[in-house]
Amino acid sequence: MKDPAHDAAASSRPPSPLDYSDTLRQSIVDHLGRHERRALPLEGHRHAAVAILLVDSEVGSDGDDAFKFTAEQMSIIPSDVTGLDGRMAGVAGGASFVLCRRSAGLNSHASQWALPGGRIDAGETAAEAALRETDEEVGVRLPASAVLGELDDYQTRSGYIITPVVVWAGPTVELRPNPDEVLAVYRVGVHELLREDSPRFVTIPESDRPVVQVPLGGDLIHAPTGALLVQFRWVCLDGRVDERVADFEQPVFAWG
């Protein structure tokens, strides 16, 4: 007889880390080249760009995370959070993306998970804005040639259209987070996105759209960041270039 607890543990166990290699880079470039990106009209929305910043990392280099959420803070998540504490530890290894915990002192979305990024300035392209924000937020300055491509725009409840830009930073990059904007920065192995239990979906009474959740470390990453990471997995890692995430809902706590 199968042990349900064993099956659940197996489904949450990520595959082995992926090598940060030219082979992976070229595979991502090829998949993005076959992806027909969907851009959304602004129609009064503010335009922002984020970087899915791909770096290398060592297994075990993130053995602890001092920023633990309280049970009250975790209670706003529309899901069973048993065993979760909001920490991002034990997720590094191989090809990774950079995930930020926003500063607690910010006026909006304080302490929430985010990718490096921000508003697109007048005259900037999404790629230029993503590179600028990467420099400003995590101290990584990269040339335009580091950009591999873009994924679909995502419209947020707070009035933004977000353009995700996939960026290859190189194997020796040093992260230097700006404390005014970023409380902590993490290298999360992209293999964590390939877990059998990821992504997962829940329903909420406030919307008929499914709320997407990406299990990472001791937390669940929600849209918009979660939606962008899901499309990155499907398109760039799995090669499922026609998959879309525009209909994935955000949790109510992220609507403001």
Predicted regions and their residues:
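N-terminal leader/linker segments that precede catalytic domains of diphosphate-processing enzymes
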Residues: 1-114, 119-136, 140-173, 215-256
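NUDIX/MutT-family hydrolases
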Residues: 177-216
